[in-house]
Regions:
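Selective transmembrane helix interface/packing segments
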Residues: 1-345
Length: 345
C-alpha cells in the first residue's frame, strides 16, 4: 500500500538522515581502513593511538580539520574558490539518494523501499549527478590562480571527461541485458542461480569485460592510484587543492571517498547481484541478510581500491590518456556489440 503524502515526507526525511549519517561514517572509516591496510602492507602499524586499534582516529581528524586555520590566499578568485569544494562534495553525496540497499520492507501495512527515492531512471541520474562533480575540480584549479592548481584541474577535467565515455559504454551491456535503467530492476534481473549453484550475476553472465572496463574507468573517475595524476605530489605539489586548507580541503577529501563508495555500490548493483547473496540463510534473517550481502560486497570493492593503492605505481599522463582512448574505449565498444548480438540471438 502506498504511503500518504505527509507520512511519505516524514519517511523520506528519516531515510535521508540515516543514509547521510551512514555515508559520512563510512567515508571516515574508509580513511581509517586505508591507513591501517596500507600501513600493514608497508610493515607499519597505522593508526593506534586514539582509541582501541585507532578506531577514534577519524573523529580526531575531524576535530583537527574544524580547528585548523582556514586561510584564503589573497590572489585567488574568492567566489569560485569558496564554491568549488561545495560543488564537489554536494554532488558526491547526492548520488547516493537513488541507490537501493536491499529489498523493500513492509511496516504497518506500508511498503517502504530501502532507498531515499525510487526512480525508474536511477542509473542515468547517478551518471548525470556524478559527472557534474568535475566542475568543482575544474573551478578549484582555475580560481586558485596558481600554476600547479591549474594544471591539476586541467588534468582532472580531461581525465574525467575521457573516461566518462568508457564508463558509460561499459554499463550499456548491463542495460541491454536487464532492459531497464532502474537499479532495482537490474538487481532483480540477477536473482537466482545457473545450474543451482552459480549466481546469475552479470559478471558470470557475459559481462566480465564490461566489469573490467567499468573498474578501470572508475579508478580514473575517482582520481585514485594508478590514475591519480591530478594530485601527483612529485609534479604538482597537491594538484587542484594546493591552496585549500582546513574544512575546504576536507570537503574535497570527503568527495573523493564518497565517490569511491558510490562506485563500489554501483559495481555491486550492476555486476555482482546487489543484495542477492550466493548463499541463502534461515527465514528469520531474510530481512537482514540482503543488507549484509550488499555491505559485504561494498567492503570488498573498497578493500580492492586500497590494495591497488598500496601496490601499483602511478601512470604517466600520456600513458593514462592512451590507455583510455586506444585500449579501454575500443574494448568497451567490443563488449557492447558482443552483448547486443548475444541478446538478439
Amino acid at each position: 500500500m502506498a504511503l500518504p503524502i505527509l507520512l511519505y515526507l516524514l519517511v523520506s526525511v528519516i531515510k535521508s538522515a540515516v543514509v547521510l549519517g551512514v555515508l559520512l561514517t563510512a567515508v571516515a572509516y574508509t580513511v581509517w581502513l586505508e591507513r591501517k591496510v596500507v600501513g600493514h602492507m608497508q610493515n607499519r602499524w597505522g593508526p593506534t593511538r586514539v582509541g582501541p586499534f585507532g578506531l577514534l582516529q577519524p573523529a580526531a581528524d575531524g576535530i583537527k580539520f574544524l580547528f585548523k586555520e582556514d586561510l584564503t590566499p589573497p590572489h585567488v578568485y574568492k567566489p569560485l574558490f569558496l564554491a568549488a569544494p561545495l560543488i564537489a562534495v554536494i554532488f558526491a553525496l547526492t548520488s547516493i539518494a537513488v541507490i537501493p540497499f536491499g529489498n523493500s520492507i513492509t511496516i504497518g501495512g506500508y511498503l517502504i523501499p530501502l532507498q531515499i527515492t525510487d526512480v525508474n531512471t536511477g542509473l542515468l541520474l547517478i551518471l548525470g549527478v556524478t559527472s557534474i562533480g568535475v566542475y568543482g575540480v575544474a573551478l578549484a584549479g582555475w580560481s586558485s590562480n596558481n600554476k600547479y592548481s591549474l594544471l591539476g584541474g586541467l588534468r582532472a577535467s580531461a581525465q574525467m571527461v575521457s573516461y566518462e565515455i568508457s564508463l558509460g559504454l561499459s554499463l550499456v551491456g548491463v542495460l541491454i541485458m536487464s532492459g531497464s535503467f532502474s537499479l532495482r530492476d537490474i538487481v532483480n534481473a540477477q536473482g537466482g542461480h545457473f545450474w543451482g549453484f552459480i549466481p546469475r550475476w552479470n559478471i558470470f553472465h557475459g559481462q566480465f569485460i564490461g566489469f573490467f572496463c567499468y573498474l578501470m574507468a572508475a579508478y580514473a573517475e575517482t582520481n585514485r592510484i594508478p590514475f591519480d595524476l591530478p594530485e601527483a605530489e612529485t609534479e604538482l605539489v597537491a594538484g587542484y587543492h594546493t591552496e585549500y586548507s582546513a574544512m575546504k580541503f576536507a570537503m574535497f577529501f570527503m568527495a573523493e571517498y564518497a565517490n569511491m563508495i558510490t562506485v563500489a555500490c554501483l559495481a555491486t548493483l550492476l555486476f555482482f547481484g546487489g543484495w542477492n547473496g550466493p548463499l541463502f540463510g534461515p527465514p528469520i534473517l531474510q530481512a537482514v541478510l540482503p543488507v549484509f550481502w550488499f555491505a559485504l560486497k561494498i567492503f570488498g570493492f573498497l578493500f580492492l581500491y586500497i590494495w591497488v593503492r598500496g601496490t601499483l605505481p602511478r601512470f604517466r599522463y600520456d600513458q593514462l590518456m592512451a590507455f583510455g582512448w586506444k585500449f579501454l574505449l575500443p574494448l568497451a565498444l567490443v563488449n557492447l556489440i558482443a552483448t547486443a548480438i548475444a541478446v538478439a540471438w
